[in-house]
């Protein structure tokens, strides 16, 4: 009887270790889908789908082929094709990677953005503004995002960024984004008050399959100077009292 219980315990621990290793691929999967979704859809729609190798070998380089083969081998070619054939118009990288079983999901997750601040509160063109955010996870997040949206004084131009958070346990966390004013001919960067929205989501914020828990707002002021554009970059600080992983990869969404 004792041997039976020990065997069950070993199998249970092994399953947890396997899940942790598999979920460690989540950021890699999300990056891969963000970068190679278009190529994959073209390959799959072309009907060359006899095996993982047949599909993945048609991607442009060895790194992309390796990531594709790894993800495809986990679920098998039939399930891999099924996921991509069911995407429709909502190509949500987090949802795709959850369907490929490398990103965890939790329908009972819950989290709250607590506070946000911008430093400095105002500055001339050329200033880098740091947007800080503190958030609390009440119930474990599967795969989600902390996202920011900055809207210029005209209300017509937005800059978006998000940081991926994976298997985040209950606790308090903080992270930050940078809004850097850099010269560009593509878009005007007018002086005035910029509105900042920060949100936390299960899934990709704004996507069909996601849940946005809450949002908080802040602002900063750009004073007169040369016309430039804003760039959003994520910092992967992700400090907190709980546990989980945070990716500093920035996905420009708007």
UniProtKB/Swiss-Prot annotation:
GO terms for biological process: aggregation involved in sorocarp development; cell-cell adhesion. Residues 231-254 are annotated as: Disordered. It comes from the Eukaryota. Keywords: Disulfide bond, Glycoprotein, Secreted, Signal. InterPro entries: SaposinB_dom. Glycans are attached at residues 110, 219. Disulfide bonds join 26-103, 29-97, 56-68. Belongs to the countin family. This is Countin-2. It comes from Dictyostelium discoideum (Social amoeba). The gene is ctnB.
């Amino acid at each position: 009887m004792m041997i039976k219980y020990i065997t069950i315990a070993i199998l249970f621990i092994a399953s947890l270790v396997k899940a942790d290793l598999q979920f460690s691929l989540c950021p890699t999967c999300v990056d891969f889908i963000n970068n190679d979704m278009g190529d994959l859809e073209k390959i799959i729609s072309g009907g060359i789908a006899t095996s993982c190798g047949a599909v993945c070998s048609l991607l442009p380089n060895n790194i992309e082929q390796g990531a594709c083969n790894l993800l495809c081998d986990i679920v098998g070619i039939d399930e891999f094709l099924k996921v991509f054939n069911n995407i429709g118009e909502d190509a949500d990288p987090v949802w795709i990677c959850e369907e490929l079983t490398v990103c965890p999901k939790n329908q009972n997750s819950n989290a709250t953005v607590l506070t946000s601040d911008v430093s400095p509160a105002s500055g001339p063109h050329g200033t880098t503004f740091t947007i800080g955010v503190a958030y609390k996870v009440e119930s474990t997040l599967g795969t989600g995002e902390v996202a920011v949206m900055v809207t210029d004084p005209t209300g017509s131009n937005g800059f978006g960024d998000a940081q991926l958070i994976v298997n985040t346990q209950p606790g308090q966390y903080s992270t930050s984004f940078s809004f850097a004013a850099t010269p560009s001919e593509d878009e005007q960067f007018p002086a005035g008050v910029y509105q900042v929205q920060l949100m936390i989501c299960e899934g990709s914020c704004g996507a069909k399959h996601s849940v946005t828990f809450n949002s908080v707002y802040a602002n900063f002021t750009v004073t007169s100077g040369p016309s430039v554009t804003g760039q959003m970059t994520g910092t992967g600080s992700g400090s907190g009292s709980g546990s989980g992983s945070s990716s500093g990869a920035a996905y420009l969404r708007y």
